[in-house]
Amino acid sequence: MILEHAVLDVVPGQETDFEWAFGEARELISASPGFLGLELLRCLETPSRYLLLVRWESVEAHTVGFRQGPSYERWSSLLHRFYSPFPVVEHYASALSTSASVV
């Protein structure tokens, strides 16, 4: 599994519209082959900043399958207008993992 990480700085005052548009865009990405799930988190200290975490089967599932696929143009038209600046997207693989144990 690969984790896509993107910090999304949204134009202040556009957060509600962004979240609505993301709800629609989520349907596009979730139908993409190799998509495993996503989480969109809103920053508590900077309310116009979001952290997008997307789980993919591989980097290529994101960079080729989704970004070069038929849904990406619609994804872009829904979301890219909200970003200032445009986000840097990076991919991560697990180096170490732990979770809380239940007693």
Language-model segments: which ranges?
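Conserved GNAT-fold acetyl-CoA-binding loop/helix
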Residues: 19, 23, 69-70
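Active-site-flanking beta-strand signature of metal-NTP-handling nucleotidyl enzymes
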Residues: 3-8
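Conserved catalytic motifs of the protein kinase core domain
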Residues: 1, 48-49
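Short, surface-exposed ligand-recognition loops at beta-strand->loop->(often short) alpha-helix junctions
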Residues: 9-20
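Glycine-rich beta-strand-turn "strand-cap" elements at beta-sheet edges
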Residues: 39-48, 76-103
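An amphipathic, aromatic/His-enriched active-site/gating alpha helix that lines ligand/cofactor pockets
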Residues: 27-36, 55-90
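Short hydrophobic/aromatic beta-strand micro-patches
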Residues: 9, 41, 53-55
